[in-house]
Amino acid sequence: MIISADKSIQKHYAPIPVGNGDLSVMIDFTGSNDCTDPAYSLHRAGIRQQAVNAQLFPFGRITQQYCGNNSEIVDWQQSLDTANGLVSGRTVHKNGVILESRVFCHLEKNVIGFHKIRRNSPGNYTFRFECGNAPRMHFEPCEDGLRWSCDGISEFHGVIHFLSDTPLQRKFENGIYSISAPAEDFTFFMVFDEPEISAYPAFDELLAESAKCWEPFWQEAYIRVPDTELMKTYEVSRYHLRINQTRWSMPVGLFNSHFGGRYFAFDEFFCAHALASCGHFALLKKIIDFRYAGLQWAKYRANGYYHNVRKDARWAWETLENFEEGSLCGHWQDHIFHMAHIALETWYYCCYSGDREYLRSKGIDILEGCAEFYMNQAVISLPDGRKIITKCCDLERFGPGRENAYLTTCSAMAALQIAAECFIAENYCTERAAEYLETVKALRESQPQDENFYFAVPANDQRSVAVLGGIYPYDNVMGFEDEKQRRTIFDFMENDAQFGSMYPHLGGKGNLCRWYAGWESIVLSRYGLRDKAYEVLRDKAEETGMFGQIYELYNARRIPWFATGEGIFIQAVNELFLPNGEKGQGKPPWNEYSFKLRSRHGETVEEHS
């Protein structure tokens, strides 16, 4: 799909990200970072500073100079071809200068290609790479480029080559590496640590090679419906998830503005679920392999000296590539519901893919670690016989030290439920599985409530999206037959505009934030209300940006290309076809449609109306 925007569109503009899970940069309509916030300049996955919260090293800004480019830009167009990641742009200056640009990042090689065509602009075109200047970051010129090194959470080093078929004038001065040529039609590449690419490749040939790498991804799933805006957001969300997937896992985004590209198990689950229902199992497996690789670290975090004899596992809230905690100190470090997200994404990989061998060899260890953490360090047995979840940080807007919080309780129930199902299926620790199920029942009975409603927290001091948790994201653990839960959910939905922001100081803006709308839509689909679920996605949520991109909060212009919201949106759309990953649940809300998705029973489902 080719998605275009221009200066006349009255929506928030954010540059388009290009990358491959290692490289990440946003490209604006000038085909550079000339009109881009410095936060969205070039970054690389995993290359981190030694700062307390281990921000990514900012590699540098891509800027340009040519005769007439100081003149005001009076018109512009920009487009993204999601099939191959090509970003095209055209700018018109007040003085008549026109610049056309094509930019792409190879999906499987660390190469960014640029094609520039100038009109009415005599003299040289100069491409400038303004090197990052973070502490302990160093650049020096070498043949055809720059040698770089960073001393951060580890020592990093490499080479950036600047290649072109045009003879170049090269200069490195004041931290800026520049290449210049008089050509009006100019093609060049930035090549990062790719020793086999030592000569100039043809732009269109390399683009075609990259497009071939994209083909399997797009063939694994599709939807087609007569809703242009929904299709646009669905396609750009899938595009961004693909280029946002690192060799480790799925961050919120690969920029320091996006929580430093760290790995929230809470957020990554929403992307993982979308990957599962789309059948993108190679990508999903990277996520759970990352969590499995960190299992021993998580056991040490949970048990300290006893990590070799106890099975409880507690992963960091904002996990770094070395499995350590990357977040700043705050009450968010007291979250515990993310262990359920790790359990669920592991379970979903095994269910949707049908990979039972992984479940037996590795998955069962992850599920056990999560379940044992809740049993031993979260569930409290009260003198009156009730069981509740201990004080912790539930949703951050509730503040610290919330006991028996609804969402966290649902998370523990879900982790225990699926661990028990797995244990019984594999004939493993069946007596412990029975204890898990007894605990699930006891926790359900102790949820904060009165005769009419469940409460997000016992104090019932504010409504919250948390009350949806018994259906989504926690795998319907409260069941569909509970009328009190249904009343509670619809009571929240009637008031969601007031409470539909995860940040208390940014709530009450009139519309539900886009990713909370996805939560609602999924719940409605699972209740069999797919027309209403579609309406929530289409009419009730905050807007998307010019290219259909999702923001964490659109009205506040906070975090464009927000992977968490993208994952939830994709899953919400997929559940309009297969609610809860189940086929045979009635028709989607269109007369004309086609789709290819994966069911939670390991089947590929393809239908055409």
Placement of each model-derived feature along the sequence:
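Structural recognition of the beta-strand scaffold that forms the well-ordered cores
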Residues: 17, 24-27, 284, 316, ...
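The feature captures the catalytic groove of carbohydrate-active enzymes
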Residues: 252-264, 310-365, 369-437
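Short coil/turn segments at secondary-structure boundaries
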Residues: 210, 214-229, 248-255, 286-288, ...
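Carbohydrate-binding surface patches
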Residues: 108-116, 599-609
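Acidic/polar, glycine-enriched structural segments that form the non-catalytic walls/loops
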Residues: 2-261, 293-299
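Active-site core of glycosidic bond-cleaving carbohydrate-active enzymes
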Residues: 261-296, 335, 339-344, 348-352, ...
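Amphipathic, well-ordered alpha-helical segments in soluble domains
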Residues: 34, 57-62, 85, 233, ...
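Catalytic cores of secreted or luminal carbohydrate-active enzymes
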Residues: 51-72, 564-598, 602
